[in-house]
């Protein structure tokens, strides 16, 4: 029998990379949560970091709350009720994400994890993501003096209803797929330059790229590069296909579109966006989604003109400034 309250359940704290069993437990929980919510509870980059552990660029803290059987060893054979992950930068700023198994919601699991985190690390320099605009997350954030500081919209279009213009590439520019073992350095350079003011994307490393290329979803055919007549990479559209998950059908994603600064303003970004969407349409997917910051008015306007509508949103919370 499981004790009635999370207060009595053990919180396991791991500094650095997590072991194989805990990673499996976390993945199983995330699969159940995504089936229930239709949204991932933890970002892809955080999962990559959990596998890799600490590095010169960040440190990792994971708190796992287990619901043990009454007579079992707390270290084995229990259900993972929820977990919290903090990815911290060298300056002690960090981002918190929490996932709770659907079977253990509305029992105080997230609050137990947050209080354990408060005791272990405190909240200095910490912001938190809620993937999906959940009322429970908003209530929990307010309880600890946090309020929304950023909205990341999820926008979606139904491919059957899409009537897209042709992708008009600038003169002398052509598209080709990414070639593993050849294009990594060129892509990293363009990505870094294109997202110089967007640290989450622009700071991706060779190791980060390699980790994504090892994921089951990676397909170089859907990783489109725009090159000039001399073969120089000017931009890219990396698409992604989320496979069918339970009752949720497969869906395409405009994963990331980037254009080198010297090619910006030429219409290449729009052409790349259209080319990637067309690629996903041709796969027979029923819909295509993307993420964009709510306050990025030019991007939101472009996507709306292409037929995207707001579907859901992720909310980042930060401490309320007094005064």
From Swiss-Prot:
GO terms for biological process: mycothiol biosynthetic process. Residues 77-176, 173-323 form the N-acetyltransferase domain. One of its GO terms (molecular function) is mycothiol synthase activity. It comes from the Bacteria. The keyword Acyltransferase applies. It catalyses: 1D-myo-inositol 2-(L-cysteinylamino)-2-deoxy-alpha-D-glucopyranoside + acetyl-CoA = mycothiol + CoA + H(+). It is an enzyme of class 2 (transferase). Its EC number is 2.3.1.189. Acetyl-CoA 2 binds at residues 257-259, 264-270. SUPFAM superfamilies: Acyl-CoA N-acyltransferases (Nat). 1D-myo-inositol 2-(L-cysteinylamino)-2-deoxy-alpha-D-glucopyranoside binds at residues 44, 200, 240, 253, 291. InterPro entries: Acyl_CoA_acyltransferase, GNAT_dom, MshD_Acetyltransferase, Mycothiol_AcTrfase. Acetyl-CoA 1 binds at residues 98-100. Keywords: Acyltransferase, Repeat, Transferase. Monomer. Belongs to the acetyltransferase family. MshD subfamily. HAMAP family: MshD. PANTHER family: L-AMINO ACID N-ACETYLTRANSFERASE (PTHR43617), MYCOTHIOL ACETYLTRANSFERASE (PTHR43617:SF31). This is Mycothiol acetyltransferase. It comes from Pseudarthrobacter chlorophenolicus (strain ATCC 700700 / DSM 12829 / CIP 107037 / JCM 12360 / KCTC 9906 / NCIMB 13794 / A6).
């Amino acid at each position: 029998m499981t004790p009635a309250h999370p207060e009595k359940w053990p919180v396991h704290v791991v500094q650095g990379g997590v072991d194989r069993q805990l990673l499996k437990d976390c993945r199983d929980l995330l699969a159940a949560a995504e089936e229930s919510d239709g949204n991932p509870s933890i970002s892809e980059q955080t999962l990559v970091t959990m596998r890799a552990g600490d590095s010169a660029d960040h440190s990792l803290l994971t708190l796992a709350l287990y619901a043990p059987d009454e007579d079992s060893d707390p270290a084995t054979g229990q259900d993972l009720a929820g977990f919290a992950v903090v990815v911290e930068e060298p300056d002690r700023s960090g981002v918190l994400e929490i996932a709770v198994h659907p079977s253990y919601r509305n029992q105080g699991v997230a609050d137990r994890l947050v209080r354990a985190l408060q005791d272990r690390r405190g909240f200095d320099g910490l912001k938190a993501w809620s993937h999906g605009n959940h009322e429970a997350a908003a209530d929990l954030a307010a309880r600890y003096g946090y309020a929304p500081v950023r909205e990341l919209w999820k926008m979606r279009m139904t491919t059957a209803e899409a009537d897209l213009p042709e992708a008009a590439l600038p003169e002398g520019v052509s598209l080709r797929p990414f070639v593993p073992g050849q294009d990594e350095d060129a892509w990293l350079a363009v990505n870094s330059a294109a997202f110089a003011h967007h640290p989450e994307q622009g700071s991706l490393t060779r190791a980060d790229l390699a980790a994504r290329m090892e994921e089951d979803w990676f397909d170089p055919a859907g990783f489109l590069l725009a090159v000039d007549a001399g073969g120089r990479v000017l931009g890219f559209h990396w698409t992604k296909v989320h496979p069918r998950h339970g009752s949720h059908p497969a869906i395409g994603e405009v994963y990331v579109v980037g254009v080198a600064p010297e090619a910006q303003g030429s219409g290449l970004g729009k052409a790349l966006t259209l080319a990637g969407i067309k690629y996903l349409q041709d796969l027979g997917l029923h819909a295509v989604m993307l993420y964009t910051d709510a306050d990025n008015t030019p991007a939101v306007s472009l996507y709306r003109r292409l037929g995207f509508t707001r579907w859901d949103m992720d909310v980042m919370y930060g401490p309320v400034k007094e005064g």
